[in-house]
Amino acid sequence: MKRVLYSFFTIAAILIGLNFLGSSVSALGQEDKWEYVIQTSIESGYSTAMPFPKQIRKNVQNGKWEAISYPIPPTDTFIRENGKVAYAIDHQLNIYDRSANKILLPLMEKNKKQLSNDMKKLHRNHYGELITWNDANRLLPRYSIFKVLDLDTGLSFEVQRRAGSYHADVQPLTHDDTKIMKKIYRGTWSWDRRAILVLSENGQFAGSMHGMPHGQGALKNGFPGHFCIHFQDSITHKSRKMDHAHSIMIKKASGEWLDHTQKLSPQEIVDATVLAIHQHDWFILSPILDDRNRILLEKHLEELEEIELIKRLSDLPREDGSTKLTFPITVKLQVHRSSGTTNRMVTFDLYRPTIEEPWTVDLEKLLKQL
């Protein structure tokens, strides 16, 4: 009996001691698991993880933190602690505590260099290589078979390229592949653009697909026609120009969207806003907003998600806004909710503090018109 009591008190003392040692060791003596994770949203079904270095972890645990009054910048990179996304890392290598809304004061120089190298490696592993249509046409020849991975759901299916002079005309390989593709589009075929990775024996490439069967189909796969995959510099048959929505999704699939938003023109901001609201893709919308409008986005997400379709019906102005600080753009939009469809003239009020800074859209004024 004494031996049993002795063992009990010994284990209890060890557990208490471990608790005082801090969160780096669990009650079972196992070290907490920390890892990088990269994904376009916390809910994304596709993510890439990598071990988080112990020396940076110590810096995070023992470093000085400062409260922030602004929202955490849009990012695709996080630190996961025991399966929970606890911290965010922006593209300037700042680390934020997501629950406490704090920023870690600058990392030690050696840790910052390590973090930079890790971010580059993680980025390469997760996203697709940005290749031109000329390269894609060569690397993915007609009748080649490759895999398509949807960046948001993480679902993948196999396709065969059948044709296409300006972009790839492809078909799901089997009935099962068709079912997976339709699941990605929530059970309904759609012209909506989606960011994808094209996985072939020649590499991992950034692309954009739509989900509407059209034209001819030759495979016995239950898919009535083919669909299109675009790469950088691909053009549509009708316009002979690169489709802006496909271009946005290609930037998303290559991991360049967050940085690319700094260079968008007012006209591109309008189209990106419409696309993001239509597809409820807040990863696209958030980085083109400033802090004030990002807070508004969080407050009005439910209201925006009630919009089932939004489409631009009129042309954008060709006026150059390179020397301006404000730029109102009025377009005709079709807006559909469960209550019905309306066509209306809507003004996007775009502004920037200086000509060196990126454009943003006044979300509050836009919401009142939608």
What are these regions (language model features)?
Residues 2-27:
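Sec-dependent N-terminal signal peptides of Gram-positive bacterial secreted proteins and lipoproteins
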Residues 27-63:
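Short Lys/Arg-enriched alpha/beta "domain-start" segment
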Residues 101-130, 137, 238-268:
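Pro/Ala/Gly-rich low-complexity, hydrophilic intrinsically disordered segments
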Residues 136-139, 320-370:
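Exposed beta-sheet edge and beta->alpha loop/turn motif
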Residues 180-268, 275-276:
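Exported/periplasmic cell-wall-interacting domains
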Residues 254-303:
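Core segments of small alpha/beta cavity-forming domains
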Residues 282-326, 339-341:
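Short solvent-exposed beta->alpha transition segments
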